[in-house]
Amino acid sequence: MGLTPAPQEGLVINPATDRPLAANDPYFLSINDKLADKGFLVTSTDELINWARTGSLMWMTFGLACCAVEMMQASMPRYDVERFGFAPRGSPRQSDVMIVAGTLTNKMAPALRKVYDQMPEPRYVISMGSCANGGGYYHYSYSVVRGCDRIVPVDIYVPGCPPSAEALLYGILLLQRKIRRTGTIER
C-alpha cells in the first residue's frame, strides 16, 4: 500500500487520478466553466482570504503633527474611507494597519514601536507625509527620527507636506492591491 504525498498548496487534485492539475488543464477548465454557468465562483482559499482581508482593514491612527488633520479629513463624508472597508479602531490590538502621520521624534520612537508590537499579525504600516517618510523639514534636527522606517517596517509611503486626503486614499488602495497581490500567508 503506497502512500501518496500531500498535495502542495494552491494545486487542484483530479479526483479520478489523485494527481495535481495545472491551471490550464482541460479538466480543470471544463469544471470551472460548468460551475461558472451555475453561479459558482471557483477560487483558492488564499485568494478568498486576501479578498476578505482587503475589504475589512482596521486602522489605527498615530497622528503626530499636521498630517493628522488630513488623515482625519479622509474619514469625513467627502472621502469616506470606510466605503472601501477601511474602518478606524481605538486599540492597536484590534488594528491591521497603522498610519504614521507627522514628525517622529526620538522620544516618541519607543512608543511607536510598542504600539506596532501590540498589533496582531499580519500588520501593515502606512507612512504619511514628508516628516514620517524621511524627517521632512526637520530632517537635520537632533531630536527627529529620519523616517519611521528606521523604527517599524513600512509598506506604503504617501508623499507630501501635508499629503492631501486623496493621496492617503490612493495609498490605502495601493495597500489593498499589495495585500491581494502578495497575500498574507507569506508575510
Swiss-Prot record:
Record gene name: nuoB
Record key words, sorted: 4Fe-4S, Cell inner membrane, Cell membrane, Iron, Iron-sulfur, Membrane, Metal-binding, NAD, Quinone, Translocase, Transport, Ubiquinone
Function: NDH-1 shuttles electrons from NADH, via FMN and iron-sulfur (Fe-S) centers, to quinones in the respiratory chain. The immediate electron acceptor for the enzyme in this species is believed to be ubiquinone. Couples the redox reaction to proton translocation (for every two electrons transferred, four hydrogen ions are translocated across the cytoplasmic membrane), and thus conserves the redox energy in a proton gradient.
Membrane topology type: Peripheral membrane protein
InterPro entries: NADH_UbQ_OxRdtase-like_20kDa, NADH_UQ_OxRdtase_20Kd_su
Textual note on the cofactor: Binds 1 [4Fe-4S] cluster.
A Pfam family of this chain: Oxidored_q6
Residues annotated as signal peptide: none
Species of the source: Methylocella silvestris (strain DSM 15510 / CIP 108128 / LMG 27833 / NCIMB 13906 / BL2)
An MF annotation (GO) of this entry: quinone binding
E.C. number: 7.1.1.-
Keyword Amino-acid biosynthesis: no
Main location: membrane
One GO process term, biological-process aspect: aerobic respiration
Top EC group: translocase
Protein name stated in the entry: NADH-quinone oxidoreductase subunit B
Cofactor: [4Fe-4S] cluster
Family recorded in the similarity comment: Belongs to the complex I 20 kDa subunit family.
Subcellular location: Cell inner membrane
